[in-house]
Amino acid sequence: MVKLIHTLADHGDDVSCCAFSSTLLATCSLDKTIRLYSLSDFAELPHSPLKFHTYAVHCCSFSPSGHVLASCSTDGTTVLWSAHSGHTLTVLEQPGGSPVRVCCFSPDSTYLASGAADGSVVLWNAHSYKLYRCGSVKDSSLVACAFSPDGGLLVTGSSGGDLTVWDDRMRCLHSEKAHDLGITCCSFSSQPLSGGEHGLQLYRLASCGQDCEIKLWVVSFTRVLGFELKYRSTLSGHCAPVLACAFSHDGQMLASGSVDKSVIIYDIGTQSVLHTLTQHTRYVTTCAFAPNTLLLATGSMDKTVNIWQFDLETPCQAGSVSDQLKHFIEDWSEEDVSKWLRAQGLEDLVDIFRTNNIDGKELLHLTKESLAGDMKIESLGLRSKVLRSIDELRTRMESLSSGIPDEFICPITRELMKDPVIASDGYSYEREAMESWIHKKKRTSPMTNLALPSLVLTPNRTLKMAINRWLETHQK
């Protein structure tokens, strides 16, 4: 389903970053160079390597058109190159001359962002090469940055562990502690969850860090409710700091690279591990998906870049996901269940589940009676959390088996929504179910159990349109 088709071994030091355009692959290294390869045969271009930087090159990024390549370095500069000739277009000097750790283009190629070790983040006009706006974070280095698919937001990650969200004028909208030991990378899915209609924008964001975790977030923005960054889930699998993460172009897969020398590929729909790749012999520092083909590049401190190819029939395509999830859970070993418990924050129950030989099949058949009576779990809170987590697994299996996208199902009724509304917790619900919840229950979020900031329910017209389109397609 995924196979190693080529290994590039031209760099003389650690590979720090790799990036695709529609026709080229760029790699950069601590050896001060950037190398360019053709995707047709992975031959290095005649004008490669690109040489200008006087110290290690940390990041490289293509403009959306693929015509311009940006690279940044410890030497305090971000260089723009012609990807097709190798000529230097301009050299952008970071204010203060601090080492530049990361750079990326906005989706419309208007801006280039560069983040530095002194915490500064600069928005450059990518056409005039002039400094447009500046921002900074306190007491941390900027180590990650990503533009939202519409270009309206820039998210940066710091060595202190904060995700910071900026608007297109570099005004700080939000800052949140995301990873206790520091962030290493962040990446937006290019496919919006919904958006464009009535001012609603919903995007998926991934972040990873020194805490060995990958976290998934939903970034939402409406003119009425403003901006929100909502934590959704944590992907487990790595046993050491995670240094890189990247979404596939269709948003259905996420790849990550780690200090544990492995690359893990996740199915975003089921949040299950699809593949674990262990060919690198040292830390995996970077990973990137190609925009138009099923290719993945991974780079490492072993000085190599591996190119992987996926079969056309990937597990993320419709018709196979439900079967995969069903087999994935029912075939879980006792150790898989232990990993799942830890991912749910239930590590205190690992020994109890092992003692009772709970594997995937047994997990799906647990009840409140068996948890209390047979397994002697006395805490009502723990029993409730276990049952809720198991219900989520069952529900995901059922919704996928029925073919209904999970985001179309009301979290309260677990039925297809007809009149979806956005509550102040950022989640969407069926209007009637949410109104009943508010009137009969405590005024807390059904998803987080936290107090609702407001009881206002905003029609989610974009989601309603998506549901109607899905119904029209699937009821023919």
UniProtKB/Swiss-Prot annotation:
What positions are modified (Phosphothreonine)? 458
Give GO BP annotations, semicolon-separated: protein ubiquitination
Tell me which domain of life the UniProt entry assigns to the organism this sequence originates from. Answer: Eukaryota
Keyword terms = Phosphoprotein, Repeat, WD repeat
* Boundaries of every U-box domain copy: 403-476
Q: Which InterPro entries match?
A: G-protein_beta_WD-40_rep (IPR020472), SAM (IPR001660), SAM/pointed_sf (IPR013761), Ubox_domain (IPR003613), WD-SAM-U-box (IPR052085), WD40/YVTN_repeat-like_dom_sf (IPR015943), WD40_repeat_dom_sf (IPR036322), WD40_rpt (IPR001680)
Per its record, how is this protein called by name?
WD repeat, SAM and U-box domain-containing protein 1
* Source organism of the structure: Rattus norvegicus
